[in-house]
Design a protein with these regions (language model features):
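N-terminal Rossmann NAD(P)H-binding glycine-rich loop of SDR-like oxidoreductase domains
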Residues: 2-22
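SDR active-site strand-loop-helix element
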Residues: 7, 30, 55-59, 99-105, ...
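Adenosine-cofactor binding site in Rossmann-like domains, unifying the SAM/SAH pocket
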Residues: 27-46
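NAD(P)H-binding glycine-rich loop region in Rossmannoid oxidoreductase-like domains
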Residues: 40-82
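Catalytic helix-loop patch of NAD(P)-dependent Rossmann-fold dehydrogenases
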Residues: 72-79, 83, 107-149, 156
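NAD(P)-dependent short-chain dehydrogenase/reductase
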Residues: 129, 140-193
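Mid/C-terminal beta-alpha module of Rossmann-like enzyme folds, strongest
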Residues: 197-245, 249
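Amphipathic terminal alpha-helices
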Residues: 268-284
Length: 284
């Protein structure tokens, strides 16, 4: 049984705590209020005092209600997505703690291909992208330890305001793009798989984790409607008519690396995951 520290008590962090098997490993989650993980000395002491073996970093800046907030809070976005995760990574490296960092695949845009881990980001630091995307690319460029798991548009079978399904349900104006998405319970199972099998994280390095066979927004809302989760105010509009502080990433990620490295790990298609989530979601 390994001692696993989950840093960040937001949507993904709390979801991991809800889905992992507590009988397999000793999981503990901390928020920044409980442990100021921006303070290297405090984090260093905490890790030693609790014999931590793994850190899963789910902390970061995503923006509320969306990434546009990063344009007015650039320093905070940079600190939370670059500076603090690098500090955590450096401490893990010093103490030989296994480090899993949950990041984003929103550093690509366009449909000329399914983007792999080997592709140079085209929506990152050196492109006309958002501060959020630039910060995610910057961390990948600077980090040299542990593994980075890229997710996109996470969703679950709950009515959490951070879930992709909840966001779509509450929007009145929609734009139709095909995007990769991550079913959070599958992500949780993958993290547990890495820990259970004591996988060498340096081999994993950077990996895309999204459910295959991405659907576009219209396909998703059609599916939502079939399960009774429809919004009568939904209207599809031209993206050019929407006011956004920063451009958005729209893309499909490849999971060839995932299926090649871990052929025994089963991941369901996006539609299968959406079917399950929509069949079980309860709208408040």
């Amino acid at each position: 049984m390994s001692k696993v520290l989950i840093i960040g008590s937001g949507y993904v962090g709390q979801s991991i705590m809800s889905w992992v098997n507590p009988d397999k490993h000793n999981y503990r989650i901390v928020s920044r209020r409980q442990l100021d993980y921006s303070n290297q000395a405090l984090l260093h002491k905490f890790i030693l005092n609790h014999d931590i073996e793994y850190i899963v970093n789910c902390s970061g800046f995503t923006g509320r209600p969306n990434v546009d907030e990063g344009e007015t809070r650039k320093k905070e976005c940079w600190d939370l997505n670059v500076v603090i995760p690098l500090n955590i990574s450096n401490i893990c490296k010093q103490l030989s703690i296994k480090y899993i960092h949950i990041s984003s695949g929103c550093i690509y845009s366009g449909y000329e291909k399914e983007w792999s881990e080997q592709d140079e980001p085209n929506f990152g630091l050196f492109d006309a992208s958002s501060t959020y995307s630039k910060s995610k690319h910057a961390f990948e460029t600077l980090n040299d330890y542990g593994c980075i798991i890229r997710v996109r548009m996470p969703f679950c079978d709950d009515y959490n305001p951070r879930s992709y399904l909840t966001k779509i349900y509450k929007y009145d104006q929609l734009i139709n793009f095909k995007n990769s998405k991550t079913y959070v319970p599958d992500l949780c199972m993958f993290i547990e798989y890495l820990i259970d099998n004591k996988v060498d994280l340096s081999i994993v390095n950077t990996i895309n984790f999204v459910n295959p066979d991405a659907l576009d927004t219209m396909q998703v809302t059609d599916l939502m409607t079939s399960y009774g989760m429809d919004n009568p105010k939904w209207v599809y509009v031209d993206p050019k008519l929407l006011k956004m502080a920063a451009p958005r990433s729209n893309c499909v990620l490849s999971i060839d690396k995932l299926t090649s490295l871990f052929p025994d790990f089963d991941i369901q298609t996006e539609k299968q995951a959406l079917d399950y989530a929509l069949a079980n979601i309860k709208i408040d």
